[in-house]
């Protein structure tokens, strides 16, 4: 009898905790709406028409025009580039079937640019979704984050991000380095990852500064062959640098990233993280990135893939 009462008590406690949590879906995070873009590449590259996708309201756009990312909270690794008048499109993130609905598939691929039928440039691109926007057309590959306004205004303090997830991870310890001319291998293990940085930003003389309010960063070292629903990525607030779980890549920029954002003058400039905020401070912006690879731009393991669906905040 006493044992039964204990089990019943624990059950009610668990129900109470669950009832206290509030779940808020991110806009378009159910992956059921996509904008399809048709971009015609330059004749020098073969003149093919490529499909690009944006995680945004259902729509079809034709023509080599920059996308207006104010229509969505999501930036994406799919890029329309126009360098010196040469138009190019690259697609590494796309909708994929899941049951009767749709999820997002993020792939790491080698993107090859052929000029007049000959291989000229090869770059490694990891499929990525992130909160922010891309400043199109991309005009240079020399500064991968120079065209990205990273993060969105955000003043909430969620407990965690939850989503449905599946992953394909190559166990080999090698990473392809493909920055343009030629490819090489380095030792390492490329892993899909999810990270969340809550920041308190301010601007001085056109420069953007930030303190880190909240942090979550999780890498997937092994494949997840079957869907894992409601996967939880907990957010920790304040200075986590002395915690047992802390790893260097969770640290302040540049360890945690080398991202940029648009300042009040409309210029994309570096986000300078200058310290950890107190745990009780309120953020001004949030960065969320979901990506098929954990290495810097143009490094990765082709064949790695990440599937995601139903992205939500927990409060």
Describe each model-derived feature in a short phrase.
Residues 12, 18, 38, 172-174:
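Residue-level detector of solvent-exposed, low-hydrophobicity positions
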Residues 6, 14, 36, 166-168, ...:
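Residue-level marker of positions within ordered structural domains that often coincide
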């Amino acid at each position: 009898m006493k044992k039964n009462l204990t089990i019943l008590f624990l059950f009610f406690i668990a129900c109470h905790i669950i009832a206290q949590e509030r779940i808020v879906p991110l806009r378009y995070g159910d992956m059921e709406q996509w904008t399809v873009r048709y971009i015609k590449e330059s004749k020098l590259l073969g003149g093919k028409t490529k499909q690009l996708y944006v995680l945004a309201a259902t729509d079809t756009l034709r023509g080599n025009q920059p996308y207006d990312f104010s229509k969505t909270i999501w930036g994406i690794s799919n890029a329309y580039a126009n360098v010196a008048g040469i138009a190019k499109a690259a697609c590494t993130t796309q909708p994929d079937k899941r049951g009767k609905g749709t999820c997002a598939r993020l792939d790491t691929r080698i993107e090859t640019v052929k000029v007049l039928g000959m291989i000229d440039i090869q770059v490694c691109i990891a499929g990525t979704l992130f909160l922010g926007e891309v400043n199109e057309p991309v005009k240079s590959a020399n500064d991968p984050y120079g065209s990205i306004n990273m993060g969105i205004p955000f003043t909430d303090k969620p407990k965690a991000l939850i989503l449905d997830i599946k992953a394909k991870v190559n166990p080999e310890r090698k990473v392809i380095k493909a920055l343009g001319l030629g490819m090489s291998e380095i030792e390492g293990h490329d892993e899909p990852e999810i990270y969340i940085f809550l920041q308190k930003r301010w601007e001085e003389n056109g420069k953007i500064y930030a303190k880190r309010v909240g942090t979550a960063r999780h890498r997937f070292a092994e494949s997840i062959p079957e869907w894992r629903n409601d996967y939880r990525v907990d957010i920790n607030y304040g200075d986590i640098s002395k915690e047992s779980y802390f790893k260097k890549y969770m640290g302040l920029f540049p360890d945690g990233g080398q991202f940029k954002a648009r300042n009040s003058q409309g210029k994309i400039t570096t986000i300078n993280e200058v310290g950890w905020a107190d745990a009780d401070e309120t953020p001004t912006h949030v960065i969320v990135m979901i990506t098929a690879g954990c290495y810097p731009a143009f490094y990765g393991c082709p064949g790695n893939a990440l599937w995601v669906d139903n992205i939500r905040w927990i409060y």
